Amino acid sequence: MEQQKKKKRAVAFGLVAVVLIFWNLMQNTADQQKLKVACIGDELTFGTAVEEREDNCYPVQLQKYMEQAEKKYRIGNFGVEGAAVQKKSKKPYTKEERYESSTDYKAGLVVMMLGTNDTTEENWTDIDTFQKDYQSLIKGYQDLKSSPEIWLVTPPMIQSDGSTEMEERAKRVEEIKNAIETIGEKNKLTVLDLYSYSQKHPEWYQEDGVRLNKDGALAVADMVGDCIINKTK
């Protein structure tokens, strides 16, 4: 009698183990079926000073957008506060740990939004240097084994307060916007023009006129999300 009970318990445990193994396999398969999107950028991507950043930075809002649209996407936030494109800048993106993490992410889509910090006096060299280093950054992702699709997002315009410094930054970010469009055309990559999109929306910015607030982050998420949906119809 006792032996039979032991056999029944063993069978029960065996069935539970099989179910758990099957469930894990299903979960792993489901995760693999999700297209990974790597959001590359600076504090505008990371969500610096955005209210409740962990819920409202643009990559998280993009994840919510995809879930509401019932699309199987997994969004990764690889934004680095203070990061710039130029290799001689104070904080080159390619020297950051998150850059390495983004290349290991095996993304199917890379969304690059960099350039805002390149406009500062301490980071700026010239537009030719920016273009060269931006192209190098693109190539780093093009050479990945996962062969991700790459989208370029122009940085938003800078809301100048009239000071000499901000006026210079506003001019440089427009140069950068034009350079990114040229690079995108040359490489046959999708370019999302956040610069023009943001021109009439001062309400998207924090007080410094550079960083985006919660509404600005949502606008970026909607723009990227709309593009993903339209390209997968």
Give each language-model segment a name.
Residues 78-82, 198:
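Short, solvent-exposed turn/loop segments enriched in Gly/Ser/Thr/Pro and often Arg
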